[in-house]
């Protein structure tokens, strides 16, 4: 879905929350686990203020207020956090968390999860509202950052075209380059997410109009890691507003969820452009294996994020408008049978109307023996599920208990 719709939906229903900055609880030593993450970072926010907590892989809270928008020079922050934070979804250097501060700030922050010390901050706005969406570290000297925002007056600063893929040297840190994304007449490219597949990075382009009044079909663009350049374009025919292409545990299958164009209240007009696409990651370029249209799955639009539970089961969420008669629902989908199983429904807002975007980030590492966690803004908790033979079994919810902000995202770190 569009970031604007998410902010509008959640902020409107959280308006009036009286939260006070919690005392920072600092870093935490968690054991390294090889390819399995050592912990989870949870971003809680009312989109005015924000807080990051650190959890053990099983969901136990280890540092409820690791960092927050109240953080100051005690952490080495030159630019304080805003209320619109994200955390890099892919692996970076051991123990380090990369925090993306989006609208209004446009800064990357590199922070040690063990000590809470900030190694560096890097402004990446280059003179315009860049709105960074993701961070993918490929080596100690190379990382990619998709910038959603476009610059209507480029040419005043280096690397200021916008709606591009920025190249970063994390060791300095510094901006070292920019890769333009393919443009369609009347639309911005809007790169929203990145994932590494072999020697390429697949960039999801959402192709929105400048005023976000509509969208074109999404596509995946492959960019080579060595000597970065565009290698191919893969249209996601018939689907709009798609999210990150997620790899299955075996890395043989890619799954992409698409929500359709979402207006400022979270409503969808063209349900037929929402769905879930499976691609064969072993072919070059990836070949479509199967698609599940929203009209066939649950009769409601999907949110544009998905999470593999096992090789054959994924989690997906429905998209509902602010104040509607419907609420977000969380489903497990069996990719072999096509059967969807309802796991949870969002709580109603205090005014009795639909909460809008209630279910946020998801994280599953069943292969590591870890539970699945799903951010639930409507209950201000993380839903927790154990995975038993492709089945998800509800366990005790997780309460972060920091400044009282609801969790919006949950992301692994190594």
Question: Could you describe each region identified by the protein language model?
Answer:
Residues 46-49, 103-106, 149-154, 208-212, ...:
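Short glycine/acidic-enriched loop and turn motifs that connect beta-strands
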Residues 159-170, 216-226, 271-281, 328-334:
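Beta-propeller blade signature
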Residues 30, 76-89, 128-136, 186-195, ...:
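Repeated scaffold domains used in trafficking and secretory/extracellular systems
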Residues 58, 112-116, 169-173, 224-228, ...:
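Short loop/turn segments that connect beta-strands within beta-propeller blades
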Residues 13-40:
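Bacterial Sec-dependent N-terminal signal peptides
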Residues 299-337, 341-377:
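Loop/turn-rich, solvent-exposed surfaces of beta-rich toroidal or solenoidal domains
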Residues 377-383, 389-414:
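Blade-level signature of beta-propeller repeat domains, shared across WD40, Kelch, NHL, RCC1
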Residues 22, 61-80, 117-125, 174-184, ...:
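A short beta-strand motif characteristic of beta-propeller blades
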